Amino acid sequence: MAKDQKIEKANNFSGTLKRIIKLMFTQYKVSSILIVFFALASTVFGIVGPKIMGQATTELFEGLVAKISNEGSINFEKIARILLTVLGLYILSSLFMFIQGWLMSNISQKMTYDIRKDISKKINTLPVGYFEQRTVGETLSRVTNDVDTLGQSLNQSFTQMISNTAMVLGVLVMMFTISPVMTLIALALIPISGILLGAITKWSQKYFKSQQDMLSDVNGQVEESFSGQNIIAAFNYKEKSVKEFNDKNNQLYTSSWKANFFSGLMFPVINFVGNLGYVGIVFSGGLLVSKGTIGVGDIQAFIQYIRNFTQPIGQIAQSMSEIQKMAAAGERVFEFLDAKDEENAEVLETVTNKEGNVVFDKVKFGYVEDQIIIKNFTSDVKKGEMVAIVGPTGAGKTTMIKLLMRFYDINGGNIYIDGKDISKLDRSELRSYFTMVLQDTWLFKGTIMENLRYGRLDATDEEVIEAAKAAHIHHFIKTLPGGYNMELNEDASNISQGQKQLLTIARAILADKPILILDEATSSVDTRTEVLIQKAMNKLMEGRTTFVIAHRLSTIRNADKILVLKDGDIIEQGNHDELLEQKGFYSELYQSQFAE
């Protein structure tokens, strides 16, 4: 939406509302039923009050007339009984309103809590492709802003809609019992209000949807600016970054003020229509009293009912504003929860002895089905072999690893691990084969010990320390304040890039998996650290199948097999010396890197 500025309504407004209500009455059935009961009971007691209060007014008026004409006096005892009855009704109404408000707040918070749990589970079941097609900010916006909006709007709108709808219907009944003529005048307000509300709702709904989408874009922009701050500064990109943010922020501002402006029109419009109704009621009521058709107390009660009639219509209008926000946010949340999970085969095979033999058999793949980028990939990798995958950018090196780990499913051919077709293996079991060391080191906020133990959660402290020693990082850790208990910050910026790389290698050593993936593992560290890493890697790779993706060909001279990719196909295979002798594409790449 940020790209083409198209503003549109929620795709399935009524469907989203039905799903939210169904969720309420399915997962929180008892509380939801009690909410409806207490909301209706509170409304009924509030509706009866004015009619009974009118009796007190009539009694007082008739008593005054009788006293003036010396025919009687005011019956204060009867008036007191009436007022005590009304007081009791209003106390019960307020008590029931408090109970339903407490229950509704509890349900909305539980729903928010449960949806966040569902989203957390969902994140771990979605394919990698889902996240590669969306920004981090967009996903975060659904987890935070959209879920919060859903919960808050539900809390503010659901009981109001029940109470106000019941109030309107109940008040109509009470008004008919007083005067059908004045009631018909009041009813004339409904179609006028409905037409105006319909027009306002139509305009405001599309802007509420736009507001939620633009908020997602702004979050994405902020996240990118924060995570890429060093790059932005290095390339003197600050002004353009600020401009891009301001553009998105302005779009959010425009959508937000339009949404709130149109929704804000609802109450004053309804209030204006209600005031017109008062004029008609006072005029017709005066005529009816003069004819003796109704009493003075009836007019007092009817005017109170008119207020109780127009006020809930205005509150319904305000509730519609919240419901529109709830629907827009709910649609985005449900869209995330309904996203297709990674699929497993119906009949799963198991592997009892994990060795690490890998076979690519005529593999074909394209991110878009009609745009195949890997056309005919075939290779046989034996247990313990080191296989380097090289080629220019876009040749399909990283894609091959994603296919091996089933982050994506292939379009043709087969991939086998230890004789088992990976499409027949459970994804979690398949991925238990692998450990990875990437150039983009990922360390979470926590202690160094916790980060290393992420490789194997049941590892003892001694095993973690041994892995650190094997990765030549133990001595450095001991020099840090707190040693293994030192806390890394959110992006581990309180240690160097080389140290982060060594920690990820130690984590991989601790994981002790049969297949190792190295993606540019030594391309962002200094020479001394690279030597330490290479020593640790040589030990780690012993007896393990290793796939190395690197542009620096000097790091893969000792590979058992080098696969040279170009345009998705393996055009050359062999070890370093054999490929140089062929004087083909690999030789050209190698010579170009070492040309003076």
Identify the residue ranges that each predicted region occupies.
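Short intracellular "coupling" helices and adjacent cytoplasmic loop segments at the cytosolic face
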Residues: 2-10, 109, 117-141, 145-147, ...
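ABC-type nucleotide-binding domain
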Residues: 345, 351-596
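Helix-loop-helix
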Residues: 174-188, 258-331, 336-337
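Alpha-helical segments in transporter systems
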Residues: 30-55, 86, 101-105, 151-166, ...
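Transmembrane helices of ABC transporter permease
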Residues: 27, 31-44, 89, 156-210, ...
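Membrane-integrated ABC transporters
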Residues: 1-46, 61-82, 99-104, 108, ...
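An intracellular "coupling" helix at the cytosolic face of ABC transporter transmembrane type-1 domains
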Residues: 22, 26-29, 128-129, 147-154, ...
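Hydrophobic/aromatic residues in alpha-helical transmembrane segments
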Residues: 49, 53, 100, 104, ...
